[in-house]
UniProtKB/Swiss-Prot annotation:
Miscellaneous comment text of the record: In roses, anthocyanidin 3,5-O-diglucoside is the first stable anthocyanin, and therefore responsible for flower coloration, whereas this is usually anthocyanidin 3-O-glucoside in other plants.
Membership in a protein family: Belongs to the UDP-glycosyltransferase family.
SUPFAM superfamilies to which the protein is assigned, alphabetical: UDP-Glycosyltransferase/glycogen phosphorylase
The entry's keywords: Glycosyltransferase, Transferase
Protein name (record): Anthocyanidin 5,3-O-glucosyltransferase
Top-level division of the source organism's lineage: Eukaryota
Amino acid sequence: MGGDAIVLYPYPGLGHLISMVELGKLLLTHHPSFSITILASTAPTTIAATAKLVASSNDQLTNYIKAVSADNPAINFHHLPTISSLPEHIEKLNLPFEYARLQIPNILQVLQTLKSSLKALILDMFCDALFDVTKDLNIPTFYFYTSAGRSLAVLLNIPTFHRTTNSLSDFGDVPISISGMPPIPVSAMPKLLFDRSTNFYKSFLSTSTHMAKSNGIILNTFDLLEERALKALRAGLCLPNQPTPPIFTVGPLISGKSGDNDEHESLKWLNNQPKDSVVFLCFGSMGVFSIKQLEAMALGLEKSGQRFLWVVRNPPIEELPVEEPSLEEILPKGFVERTKDRGLVVRKWAPQVEVLSHDSVGGFVTHCGWNSVLEAVCNGVPMVAWPLYAEQKLGRVFLVEEMKVAVGVKESETGFVSADELEKRVRELMDSESGDEIRGRVSEFSNGGVKAKEEGGSSVASLAKLAQLWKQK
């Protein structure tokens, strides 16, 4: 395998892997002299409560890698050994960070074989455990941040918050001010950042510190989409009193459509719906709702009168009436029958990229995961923002108040969204003047995303700077 070697190490989650693969493909398209190696791994299934979900995710990872390898033989996947057993002391929440730590000996072997041609290692943020090791070995180390630029602005401020407050709760009712961002309510910050005694928090603190010391941060975004946040990052306003590493925006990176999905029932159904008429509801691989919440969602959709395509996952395992319940067992009685002329409910999965690119889809109820947001923006689909976990509440603030490409649901203190609330937001998006304005803004960003990846576009230029940096080493 010749050429200057670039090694990419993604976290073993499908969304993280897809973004890394798309980065590798982009590099080879514009700079084919590089040799791309992706370190592929699967997550351990030793935690009983999540074993089934993780095993299913691992199967998806394996199938995805096979498909990519067949279509892109220039990308080399190096399969790391599966970590079959975990130390008992590992904090469950910190598992994503710890898993990378356990892989260090295996990764060092790979890096050693590429030593003479290795130009850079690109880490997922959850793979931060490699940073100190690679710096000691003088390997140029970059981070590929799979979330938004505005989320990075928050992440880089964590050491400052840690130094100047005892807890994020110290802000009280005063919104948090971060350069390049609208005012952030404390309630929108990820809950896991409030407890500083956990290893998870300590890992986040370490990651944000290391990112600031890295050779550069690569972002799956484009300049027009996050203009204010990116200007603040590049101006060093998010890292006071120390230099900011170079910021490279190379997006939007989203996976292409697969002809293998053309026969999926959701696409066949969409073929028979009017243009821009369908609301698509999908909440990612971890988007699990209680039966009570599913029932409220169903009633809200029914009352809205809108056409819908809804991906429904099973409720939490402790709520399951049987291992694989029917829709009738988890949705209101008669709902599927009453709405069959304008709605389709599919179980567990639908080909999201293909669905969002379909002419019939006119709205997207999303958990605000960044990959999903980019897919919607690139296809000109406006959103209803319904965050569930991690940094997604920050995403809602950004999508609704900064970008103005979404309407946001309002949940109770326990996170419950009523049927009336969902009905109201779906109607607002699909059938109002404000919804039309949102649709227009998304269309502008969609066009901007296309231009960013054309020759002379901002993302192609940013990628060229990155490649030049590696070639000079």
